Each structure stands twice: as C-alpha cells, then as structure tokens.
Amino acid sequence: MNLRTLLILGALSAFGPLAIDFYLPSFPTLARQFGTDVEHVQLSLAAYFVGIAIGQLFYGPLADRYGRRVPLLVGVALFTLASLACALAPSLEWLIGARFVQALGGCAGMVITRAVVRDLCDPLASAKVFSQLVLVMGLAPILAPLGGGLLLNTLGWPSIFHSLAIFAGLCLLAVLLWLPETRPQHLQPAPLSGAFGQYRALLGNAPFMGYSLAGGVAMAGMFAYIAGSPFVFIELYGVPAEHYGWLFGSNAAGFVIMAQVNARLVRNGGPALWLRRMVLVYLASGLCLLVLALWQPLQLWPLMVPLFICVASLGCVLPNATACAMAGQGRHAGSASGLLGSMQFSVAASASALVAFLHDGSAMPMALVIALCGAAACGFAWWSKRFVV
C-alpha cells in the first residue's frame, strides 16, 4: 500500500474521532448557549454514536454490491452538508438531529477503509496497516481538542463545524482524484439481498463475533472517557477549555505510540496473542482508575496516570481485534466491516449514555464504565483464544 493511499484512508478513518473530539471543549459553552446542562449536551454525542452504528449496517452491503468508491463519495458528501447544518443549529434538538445525519455520512469512511485494507492485505499485514492508520488518524484526538478549543475562544462554536465541512470537502476531492476501486475484479458483486443476508451468517460466526465484541467493548471504554472527560477535566477540576486539548492529546499520543509499537509486536505471536495480553493491561488500569475515582483526589493528576495507561493500551487492542475479526471475510469484507463497526458503536453509544445517566458530580461514572468495559473486553478476547486466525 503506497503512502498516498494510506494517508487518504487515515483521513477517512479520522472522520469518527475528529467529529467527536473537535467539539468536546465546547460542551459547557453549548450548554450555556442552549440554556441546558452538560448532561443534555452529551446526548448530541450519543446521537452521533447511534448514527454511526446504524449507518455502517447499510454501507457494508452497498460497498459489496456497488464497489468501494460510490458509497464512499455519497457518505463524505452527506457528512459535509450535515456539518454545515450543525453550524447553523438554532437549538439543541437541531444540533442532535444534525449530528445524527453527520454520523450517517461519516461512517462511510470508517466502513470502507476497513474493507479496502481487507481487499489489499492478509491478516498479518492488516494488523500492521491498521496500526499505521492509527498513526494518521491518531492526529485527530491529539490536535482536534486543541484546535476546537482555539476556534471556540476566537471564532465561536459554529466555526468548529465549519472546519469539519472544509476537511470533509478536501477528503471528497482526494477520493475523486486518487483513490481507485479496490474490490477484487474476480469477485462477483454481491446482490443487496445476499449482502444483508450475510449479517445472519456473520452473527453466527463465533470467531468474528468474539473478536468484534472484544474490540467493541474496549472502544466503548474509550468513548466513556470521551463523554465524561469534558465534565471531569473542565467542570470538576477547573481545567480551562483551551487547555483541555493538551490533557486529551497527551492520552491520545500514548494511543498512537502504542499502535506503532503494536506493528512490531505482532511480528512475534500474531495479533490474537497481543490482543489477549493488552486487554489485561486495559483492565488493570481501569480498575486502578475506579479505585482512585472513589477516593476522589483533590487534584487531577492521580486520575491521569491510569487514564493514560488505559487509553495507550487501546492502541494495541483495537487494531488487533479488528484484524482478527476481518480475517477470512473475503467477498463479504464490506458487510463484515459494516457489522463490526455497527456493533462497536452501538456499545459505544450505550457507554456514553450510561456515563450521562450515572452523572453524580464526580469522576466515578466515567471510571466505573471504563472498568466494566475492560472486564468485558478481557472476557471476549480470552474466550476467542480457541479460534485460529
């Protein structure tokens, strides 16, 4: 895979984290703007997760039937228009609806990127490519909160969504010019009825389900952190909105670094082995975070240490779980990618909503959900040990 293709796929993969992380510093501002509280603003985040979960179920079969390019172009165009609608939101209800539509467009890049990697790479190479994609898309959670905080303080919250529209427009142009069709020509286009019917077979595929759920609940812990951190950092511990991005970015840097380390680790033992090892690190750091949250330290830094370890470990967990789940999917790579992403973001939406539901003015809800996700990820990863990928 050449560098240009890798960069385009990385940018498309970044739609999800960029559209999430870019507006996180604006949560308190949006609450004041619309005369509500942060917990209700978090519903716009949950709506985005629900949109991604639903949309991926459709893009997968469409990519298997019509190829990778056409559904991708439609999705990126929809994301661009919905971003502009978010910028014009006169109410929180409008913003929540526009975020849902934005997710329906943005998930095209996430689904079809995984399918393209599966088209071009075997399982071991896929694990390495997914780790490299994390490096590209990992710039989003590092730079997005910083940029979002800067735009918030200089141009106001609508500029955040204007910037997302510009980014999506550039990605649309890049796909048109430089990303060819990658679906193997020897594969007959899957009929839509058969493509959607493939979901039943995938749901009964134990290796696919085990590794998909391991990655899904691990990702849910990440999004529990994303949903809870604006309140914990800014409201609970008084971190200025413009400084929030530095703290968020430090954790994201750990995620990116470990993803690059993972590309080397999988050479010895394969992705399944390192998935099982790193979910143990994820669980241990999540439990440590929960204990500290119950202790309620007066300063933020005791919570930041286990948070950093937890997020960094996901740099190994997520690419390996994805590579294992996508192994052997062949003709139905699009459907497999769609179902994988849908399950992951369904769980993520539930986790972010649970953090909001449990809100009690402390860091405990965020920490509890992260610890529970770590335990579930361990269970699914080790249950899947019996399967060879």
Predicted regions mapped to residue ranges:
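Helix-breaking motifs and short loop linkers at transmembrane-helix boundaries and internal kinks
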Residues: 35, 67, 88-94, 105, ...
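Structural signature of the two symmetry-related core transmembrane helices
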Residues: 70-84, 274-289
